[in-house]
Amino acid sequence: LDHSRVEAFLKTGAAGTAEEQKKMCEQMHLTDYNYLLLIPAQERQAETHVGEELRLMMIAEQVRQSYGRTQFVYNTTEGSVLVVLTLDKGTEAEQVQMCRQTEALHGLLEMTEPLILSGRFTRLEQLSSVYWQARNMAAYSDRTQKVCYLSGESLVRVTTTDITSLERLNEYLLSGRAQEAQSLIGE
């Protein structure tokens, strides 16, 4: 994908013509089950002095190894890395596995800050909004966590071992019922 087109899309949410949108969806491998993973900017990591290109190649390879297939990996202009994770069927087992793989990726990348993982989005048009929510919420992330889960406009503090029913948790979070989500996390 053309870097300037992707950057313009992330900033404005405008993906261009229907043909351009279709091409972008194909190149990002979008399915009905997409999740955004935001990896913090390089300058915010301790002791990392790797060029942007090399860093992006290394992250892309770690992502491929962690999730077992190629995912869309993109280096934003502010230095964070955006990864579009896709699932085949969006089953609870797939989602829990994705969360575990994301926590493992945190260790492989030797991150000092948490990764931000969004809830599900289904359309290309939603990507820009999800990206900005993740980017804005990164400043408020819990530094003691490997992964912070973004739900709507708030971060949810959970680890994959706390999730007994990811589908039910997603339902609570999407409907704004944070109290029920917290009680589910406590189970």
Predicted regions and their residues:
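Soluble C-terminal extramembrane regulatory/interaction domains of multi-pass membrane proteins
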Residues: E94-Q95, C99-G107, Q179
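Interdomain helical linkers/hinges and coiled-coil/dimerization scaffolds
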Residues: L1-Q95, R120-E180, I185-G186
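Catalytic core regions of nucleotide second-messenger enzymes
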Residues: V73-E78, L105-L115
